[in-house]
Amino acid sequence: MAKKSMIAREVKRAETAKKFAAKRAELKAIIASASSSEEQIWEAQTKLQQLPRDASPSRQRNRCRVTGRPHGVYRKFGLCRHKLREAAMRGDVPGLVKASW
């Protein structure tokens, strides 16, 4: 099980990214726009750099909803491979069966 502080940090990062998503999108649009002047692009880049680091969605890490484990997490289920296997063996995941060939 991951430390509670690590899980809380990830939750905080998600909230920060959500809070600044519109502002980041607006600044990135100015930077990517061909009609923007060099001065506007420079200003937008400066403002983008001044936003909090955790406002970037790439700083987020997928974690298991049960254990908080950062590796081996299946996006579709939100569970790490260990807990997904346990849930599948109990029959908690409809349509998921153990492979057999």
Swiss-Prot record:
It comes from the Bacteria. GO terms for biological process: translation. GO terms for molecular function: rRNA binding; structural constituent of ribosome. It holds the Pfam family Ribosomal_S14. SUPFAM superfamilies: Glucocorticoid receptor-like (DNA-binding domain). Belongs to the universal ribosomal protein uS14 family. Binds 16S rRNA, required for the assembly of 30S particles and may also be responsible for determining the conformation of the 16S rRNA at the A site. Part of the 30S ribosomal subunit. Contacts proteins S3 and S10. This is Small ribosomal subunit protein uS14. The lineage of its organism: Bacteria, Pseudomonadati, Pseudomonadota, Gammaproteobacteria, Cellvibrionales.
